[in-house]
Amino acid sequence: MLHVILRTCDRHSLVSTRIVNKKECILRCLNSILTNLESIEYKSLHIIDDNSSYDFRNKLKSIVEHLPYVTINYLPGRDQTGLSAKKKSRYSVQVAYQYIYNLPDDDLVYVVEDDYLHFPNAIQEMVDTWNYFSKFIPFNIGIFPQDFNQLHLHPAFNHNETYFQSCFVVPSHQRYYKTTWFTQESFMIQSKLFKQYKTDFDKLLNIGDDPSCWEGNTISSVWNKPDVKMFMPLGSLVVHMSDKTDIPFFISKKQVIKLWNKNKTFWSLEQDSQVQL
């Protein structure tokens, strides 16, 4: 069984240089997830909406209400005076993890942020790769869907000494994957791994309070445990529609726009559909 956990919010953005309209981005990224899930038999999609606008919630509901495998938890409003955008997002992370901690141990969980635009068959490939690697790699396997630029050594990057580390590369049936010490907040692992390392995952809730906390010393500490191997594809399964610097290597502007256009919904308006690349 695959559980996809998607956190949505149209009220604030962590990226000021976002390349697309945030509301439109969420709907198109959701559509790409729904298209991916069509071919997966045993699945659920649980959406945690963090106090989005009334209009957006109605749009969200209209897109998924006919799908029996989708549930939505609409979080109520709360006092967030003086909180940074990053800190505001921690509450929905907490709710998501509480949900995951109650799932069956052996089920797969794909936690995904609302600005990941998926290529066709991306999620099926993640599941297939997890199953394949689990047969001959004697570790708990994780899949990070993004071919994240900063995890490659590059002369234009300012933080090579932080992000770039040695790895090993394994071929799957579709492409090569490399081990990674780091992920952002979108990844797929078994539910039991969340429970085994609950203390490490819960440290993610401190981001926004403690300036020293980031993905690299919270959730990524799990990927560096002796019983865990996290993999990322060499050739991205998603496009992170945030800043243009996040567009993966060898993914062209034409490919991004084609994927973006392919996932428009009946709510899409021309003025909200521009991609700034």
What do these predicted regions represent?
Residues D49-D50:
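Acidic ATP/Mg2+-coordinating residue in the GHKL
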Residues L2, N36-H46:
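Short loop->beta transition adjacent to catalytic acidic/histidine clusters or analogous donor-positioning motifs
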Residues H12-E24, T81-K87, D202-D210:
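Short, flexible/disordered intra-domain loops and linkers
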Residues M1-T35:
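N-proximal low-complexity "stem/linker" segments adjacent to membrane-targeting elements
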Residues D106-L117:
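Short beta-strand-to-loop acidic/aromatic patch adjacent to the donor-nucleotide binding site
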Residues T180, I189-L277:
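C-terminal catalytic/acceptor-binding lobe
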Residues S53-D106:
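Active-site-proximal specificity loops/subdomain of glycosyltransferases
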Residues F119-D202:
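Conserved catalytic core of nucleotide-sugar-dependent glycosyltransferases
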